[in-house]
Curated annotation (Swiss-Prot):
GO terms for biological process: tRNA modification. This is tRNA(Ile)-lysidine synthase. It holds the Pfam family ATP_bind_3. It is found in: Cytoplasm. ATP binds at S37, G38, G39, A40, D41, S42. Gene3D superfamilies: HUPs. Its main location: cytoplasm. One of its GO terms (cellular component) is cytoplasm.
C-alpha cells in the first residue's frame, strides 16, 4: 500500500510540475479542457487532474471526439466509456464528427486519414474551449510520443526546429505529461485501478508511428542501451546551434519585399550572396512562406534554390523559380517544362460510380464479392474486391503493400522495379482500404495489377 501511494504521489508531482511550468495564468479558478480519448495516456491525465484540481484551483471539463472512422461498436464504445467515467466527476462533452467527414477532409487537404482526423479533432477542441471559455486545452502526449515524433522527423529529413519534438505549449494548448514515460503512466493506472480502452489501430503496421513504436524502438533499445539519454543530449546541442542561427538571422539587414502585383518576392542580389548557407536557407524559407501558404516543401527544393549565383542566374525547382534580374533576386511560383511531381488526387468510393483521375477514367463496379475498380482501357474485371468506403489516390511517402510472403514492400520500390516513367509515377492509382494500401493499378501503364484481398493473399 505504501509503495502504491508513493508511486501515485510521484506521478501526480510530475504532472503538477509539468503543468505549472507551462501555465502562466494567475486568474482563479482556472478552466481546463482535457482532451480524453479513453486511452491510457488521457485517462491518466484526467485522473491526475481530478485529484489535483483543488491544489491548482481549477474547474475540469472533458471533451471526447468520435471520428466515425472505425467500426461503430468500437468508436461509440470509446466515447461511452469516457462519458461513463466522467458521469459524477466532471462535465464531459461528446463531439461527433459525421461519417465520411474525415475521408472528405483527407481528400480536400491532400493528406492521409491520420492528418485529416487530427485537423478536425483540434477544430473540435478549439470550438469547445471557446464555448466553455477555457483557459487551457490539455492533451496527454508523453515522453514516448515525443521520441517517436523526433525519430520520424529525423529520418524524413526535417529541419532543426522540427527535431525539437512536440511543443510543450502552443497557444492555449498545454502538454503537461511530456516528461512522463508510457510505462510510468500504465503503472500509475494499474496501481490506482483506473480502467482504459485500447485502440486497435495502435497495433496496425500500416501507420508510420506504429512501425517506429513496435519495430524501430525495440531494436534501438537492444543496440543502444539508454539511447534516449544520448538523443536528448544531441537534441540539446542541435537546439543551441539552431538558436544561434535564429539569433544571427534576426540581425540581417534586409528582408524580402512581397510584390503582390507581380506575385513574387524581391531582395538585393548582393545581400543574398552575402548570406552563409544556414542563413540563406532561413531566408529562402521565409520567402517561400510568403508565396506558398502551408504546403510542405522538400529540402531538396531549398538546396537547389540556394545555388543561385553570378554564373547560375535562374533555377527552377519544386514549382518555384529564383532568378537574378538586374541587381535583384526574384523568387516566384513557376511551372516549367521540367517534369514535376506535384500531382495529387484522392477519390473516396462508397457506391458504384464512374470517376476521372490523371491516369484516366475508372468505374467502381459492385458484385456479391464487393467492389472492383476497372480502368476504361482494361478488358479484364479490373482489380478487387474492396470493401467500401475505400480510396483511389496517388501515392504518398511511406506507402507499403503486402507481398506474397506476408512481408511489406514499399510502393516506391515496386514503381522503380516496374520502370514507370517519371511523369507517371505520381498518377499511378493506389487503392487504400481502412488506412492500408490494398492495391496498385499497374495495368494502366502496361504492368500487372498488385492487390491484397483478405486471406486470399497477394495477387499480381
Amino acid at each position: 500500500m505504501c509503495k502504491i501511494y508513493l508511486m501515485a504521489k510521484s506521478f501526480l508531482k510530475d504532472v503538477l510540475l509539468g503543468f505549472s511550468s507551462l501555465c502562466d495564468r494567475t486568474a482563479a479558478p482556472l478552466r481546463l479542457l482535457l482532451a480524453v480519448s479513453g486511452g491510457a495516456d488521457s485517462m491518466a491525465m484526467l485522473s491526475a487532474f481530478l485529484e489535483l484540481k483543488s491544489d491548482i484551483n481549477a474547474e475540469i471539463f472533458v471533451l471526447t471526439v468520435n471520428h466515425n472512422i472505425r467500426p461503430e461498436k468500437e468508436t461509440l464504445g470509446d466515447a461511452q466509456f469516457v462519458l461513463d467515467f466522467c458521469n459524477d466527476k466532471c462535465p464531459c462533452i461528446l463531439a461527433e464528427i459525421p461519417k465520411n467527414t474525415v475521408f472528405d477532409e483527407a481528400k480536400n487537404r491532400k493528406t492521409g486519414i491520420e492528418d485529416a482526423a487530427r485537423f478536425l479533432r483540434y477544430n473540435e477542441f478549439e470550438k469547445a474551449a471557446d464555448s466553455l471559455n477555457a483557459d487551457y486545452i490539455l492533451t496527454a502526449h508523453n515522453k514516448n510520443d515525443n521520441y517517436e515524433t523526433v525519430l520520424m522527423r529525423l529520418f524524413q529529413g526535417s529541419e532543426p526546429e522540427a527535431l525539437m519534438g512536440i511543443s510543450p505549449r502552443r497557444g492555449r494548448f498545454i502538454r503537461p505529461m511530456l516528461n512522463i514515460s508510457r510505462s510510468e503512466i500504465e503503472e500509475y493506472l494499474k496501481e490506482k485501478n483506473i480502467p482504459w480502452r485500447e485502440d486497435a489501430t495502435n497495433l496496425e503496421a500500416s501507420y508510420l508511428r506504429n512501425k517506429v513504436r513496435h519495430n524501430l524502438l525495440p531494436v534501438l533499445s537492444i543496440c543502444f542501451d539508454g539511447w534516449q539519454s544520448g538523443l536528448d543530449k544531441s537534441l540539446a546541442k542541435i537546439k543551441a546551434q539552431n538558436d544561434f542561427v535564429i539569433a544571427s538571422y534576426k540581425t540581417k539587414k534586409e528582408e524580402w519585399v512581397l510584390d503582390k502585383k507581380e506575385d513574387c518576392c524581391r531582395c538585393k542580389f548582393l545581400f543574398f550572396l552575402s548570406l552563409d548557407e544556414a542563413l540563406k536557407l532561413k531566408f529562402l524559407q521565409e520567402g517561400l512562406i510568403l508565396l506558398k501558404g502551408k504546403r510542405r516543401i522538400p529540402y531538396s527544393v531549398f538546396d537547389d534554390l540556394m545555388k543561385l549565383s553570378d554564373t547560375k542566374k535562374i533555377i527552377f525547382s519544386g514549382g518555384f523559380c529564383i532568378k537574378k534580374e538586374g541587381d535583384e533576386v526574384l523568387l516566384f511560383k513557376a511551372v516549367t517544362e521540367e517534369k514535376t511531381s506535384e500531382v495529387f488526387y484522392s477519390i473516396w468510393i462508397d457506391k458504384p460510380c464512374s470517376f476521372d483521375t490523371p491516369a484516366g477514367n475508372f468505374k467502381a463496379l459492385e458484385n456479391d464479392d464487393g467492389f472492383f475498380i476497372v480502368h476504361e482501357s482494361d478488358k479484364t474485371c479490373g482489380i478487387g474486391p474492396f470493401k467500401p468506403p475505400f480510396c483511389v489516390r496517388s501515392r504518398l511517402f511511406g506507402d507499403e503493400i503486402e507481398t506474397s510472403s506476408g512481408s511489406k514492400k514499399s510502393v516506391k520500390k515496386i514503381i522503380n522495379e516496374w520502370n514507370i516513367d517519371y511523369e507517371n509515377r505520381n498518377i499511378l492509382p493506389i487503392i487504400e482500404e481502412g488506412g492500408v494500401v490494398k492495391g496498385i493499378y499497374g495495368a494502366v501503364f502496361g504492368k500487372k495489377n498488385w492487390y491484397v484481398v483478405g486471406d486470399l493473399g497477394v495477387k499480381r
